[in-house]
Amino acid sequence: MKPSVILYKALPDDLLQRLQEHFTVHQVANLSPQTVDQNAAIFAEAEGLLGSNENVDAALLEKMPRLRATSTISVGYDNFDVDALTARKILLMHTPTVLTETVADTLMALVLSTARRVVEVAERVKAGEWTASIGPDWYGTDVYHKTLGIVGMGRIGMALAQRAHFGFNMPILYNARRHHKEAEERFNARYCDLDTLLQESDFVCLILPLTDETYHLFGAEQFAKMKSSAIFINAGRGPVVDENALIAALQKGEIHAAGLDVFEQEPLSVDSPLLSMANVVAVPHIGSATHETRYGMAACAVDNLIDALQGKVEKNCVNPHVAD
């Protein structure tokens, strides 16, 4: 008899078929308490869980006594109670490598669109404001040769550094938990403390996961240390930034502009002051949102769940010691 798994995110037909070759698959719309209660027997028997964008906490795990592995279609896993999973010896799998290049593309797009005011001036053209040769009020700022500060030099940070160094000849500063020898050798990146990075960078790109240590890492103090001409980019996790402090910094002119793919609350409220600022490019968490990458992430998550329930945790496992 095949193990039972719960799928709470739609999959392409071929990936669903692959999953069904190994498991009895039960599909649900979400992991809300109502859904769990309505499908209590299914959740009680499930050994695997696969999906994204839902919270997996201790309360849910209490309803799933046979759960052995959960696989998320994402690299981030701050919506999972890792301690609760680990205490119950439940493996947590994620997709850390599939989306690297695509997210780096998004970061570079935010750098370019904020610096050159692409969204703002495109909207002005559509509104009929382009009636003569443009003047300084339409101008942006250069990207090439400007200093890029990267906070978080992981896979995505490295991919961004590659684009900035080879494509735009940008000097690169970085701050991370440790020195990154490859970044220093390949891109001539310079490690520095966060204060130095903030004071010297023309673009500050934040690429950090959400943890207890990174929550509100960026606040009023950090924005005050940045150049008034600096542009802030965040494509990591929204709550790493105190959004009210960011709004205040933009309103006071402490920083020049912001390109944001993530927010403290998602979806972003239609009442957010960020949406009324011409110098803010706000996109709806599209970091990995291409057809190719989202398919690759889903395929990786399917393979991860198959591997996990077969006891193979050599890669893509957040808590591999659970299998010991």
Curated annotation (Swiss-Prot):
Q: Which reaction does it catalyse?
A: glycolate + NADP(+) = glyoxylate + NADPH + H(+); (R)-glycerate + NAD(+) = 3-hydroxypyruvate + NADH + H(+); (R)-glycerate + NADP(+) = 3-hydroxypyruvate + NADPH + H(+)
Gene Ontology CC annotations of this record: cytosol; plasma membrane
- What's its EC? 1.1.1.79, 1.1.1.81
- Organism (species): Shigella dysenteriae serotype 1 (strain Sd197)
Q: State whether keyword Cell membrane applies.
A: no
What is the stated purpose of this protein?
Catalyzes the NADPH-dependent reduction of glyoxylate and hydroxypyruvate into glycolate and glycerate, respectively.
Instruction: Name the enzyme's class.
Output: oxidoreductase
InterPro entries given in the database record: D-isomer_2-hydroxyacid_DH (IPR050223), D-isomer_2_OHA_DH_cat_dom (IPR006139), D-isomer_DH_CS (IPR029753), D-isomer_DH_NAD-bd (IPR006140), Glyo/OHPyrv_Rdtase_B (IPR023756), NAD(P)-bd_dom_sf (IPR036291)
GO MF annotation terms = glyoxylate reductase (NADPH) activity; hydroxypyruvate reductase (NADH) activity; hydroxypyruvate reductase (NADPH) activity; NAD binding
Family per record: Belongs to the D-isomer specific 2-hydroxyacid dehydrogenase family. GhrB subfamily.
The record's subunit annotation is:
Homodimer.
Keywords for the protein's UniProt record, in alphabetical order: Cytoplasm, NAD, NADP, Oxidoreductase
- Give the protein's recorded name: Glyoxylate/hydroxypyruvate reductase B
**Which PROSITE patterns does the record match to this protein?**
D_2_HYDROXYACID_DH_2, D_2_HYDROXYACID_DH_3
Q: Which gene encodes it?
A: ghrB
Localization terms from the record: Cytoplasm
TM segments? none
